[in-house]
Amino acid sequence: MKKIGITLGDPSGISPEILIKSIDKLKKAIYVIYGSYKIIEKVSSILDKKTEINIIDSPEEAEKEGVYLINVYDRDFCVGKPDKETGKASVLFLERAVKDILSKKLDAIVTLPISKEYVMKAGFRYAGHTDYLADITKTEDYLMMLLCEKMKVALVTTHIPLKDVPENIKPEILESKIRLLNRELQSKFGIKKPKIAVLGLNPHAGDGGNIGREEIDIINPVVQKLKSEGIDLEGSLSADTAFNRYREFDAYLAMYHDQGLIPLKLLCFKKAVNITLGIPFIRTSPDHGTGFDIAGKGIADPSSFIEAVKLALKLSKQY
């Protein structure tokens, strides 16, 4: 039976609530939560919901279908009040789960949201899960991709300031990202010949060089080179109209975060899933953040987390 690790993320956010609301739906596998028993107990009380979780020390102790908890860092966290301690907890939950999956004790991991602000206050030097996972696994070619039933969007750059995006759009980087996306669509999603839309960087894809030259100098030559090798690409496309054609493409490759994720979340919010492509194990996560402002109010929607679990379990069965 497959073992799916779940990291609790920031314990003062909506993650404990989402997890508690989803427990009855966690079926057909062994689920190992990396978190804090006290916060799960506290939020269960707030929600007036009885939560039965088996506490273990290692995934190897979990032998039958059910939900288990490794009590990684147990403190009396305050709901909706993040601080350096909740940031530290987020990091410890993640580090333990990654250690276990690299030791082959898990088949996939699902990561609940962390706060970049508070993990950095706790000494974490990464902009998010994706960069950490790539570094810890020594993965050079990796991609952040969000997907739902209607659309898949991968990103060339992720959590960097907008002003730094152009200098990170380089021919060798773009080429490796396209090749990786094509391979992963084939291997993980069973698409024999993926059709990929490559977006431009500038408005109207540079308008023939009048609004920037990145398309002419970098993006279009890479697209043409890879098309000549048989990869089915179209681009560079103007991002303001490209998403009207989402039914025509198996995936989009966006140049930066908001360019790709605004349309995806508009179309699929609450159902989208984040997956890290290129790393040597399966990692998914929901498409939302920590939700500190609504933590403890009982209104957090677990739908995206449930979809992330479903995808992790589905992909784990292929390996």
Swiss-Prot record:
Pathway participation: Cofactor biosynthesis; pyridoxine 5'-phosphate biosynthesis; pyridoxine 5'-phosphate from D-erythrose 4-phosphate: step 4/5
The keyword Oxidoreductase belongs to this UniProt entry's keyword annotation: yes
Keywords: Cytoplasm, Metal-binding, NAD, NADP, Oxidoreductase, Pyridoxine biosynthesis
Function according to Swiss-Prot or TrEMBL: Catalyzes the NAD(P)-dependent oxidation of 4-(phosphooxy)-L-threonine (HTP) into 2-amino-3-oxo-4-(phosphooxy)butyric acid which spontaneously decarboxylates to form 3-amino-2-oxopropyl phosphate (AHAP).
Descriptive protein name: 4-hydroxythreonine-4-phosphate dehydrogenase
Co-factor remark: Binds 1 divalent metal cation per subunit.
Entry GO MF terms: 4-hydroxythreonine-4-phosphate dehydrogenase activity; metal ion binding; NAD binding
Enzyme Commission number: 1.1.1.262
Localization: Cytoplasm
NCBIfam families: pdxA
Binding sites annotated in the UniProt record for a divalent metal cation: H159, H204, H257
Reactions performed catalytically: 4-(phosphooxy)-L-threonine + NAD(+) = 3-amino-2-oxopropyl phosphate + CO2 + NADH
Similarity comment: Belongs to the PdxA family.
Record GO cellular component, one term: cytoplasm
Miscellaneous notes: The active site is located at the dimer interface.
Binding residues for substrate: H129, T130, K265, N274, R283
Cofactor(s) demanded: a divalent metal cation
Gene3D superfamilies: Isopropylmalate Dehydrogenase
Quaternary context: Homodimer.
Alphabetized PANTHER family for the sequence: 4-HYDROXYTHREONINE-4-PHOSPHATE DEHYDROGENASE, D-THREONATE 4-PHOSPHATE DEHYDROGENASE
Organism superkingdom: Bacteria
A GO biological process held by the record: pyridoxal phosphate biosynthetic process
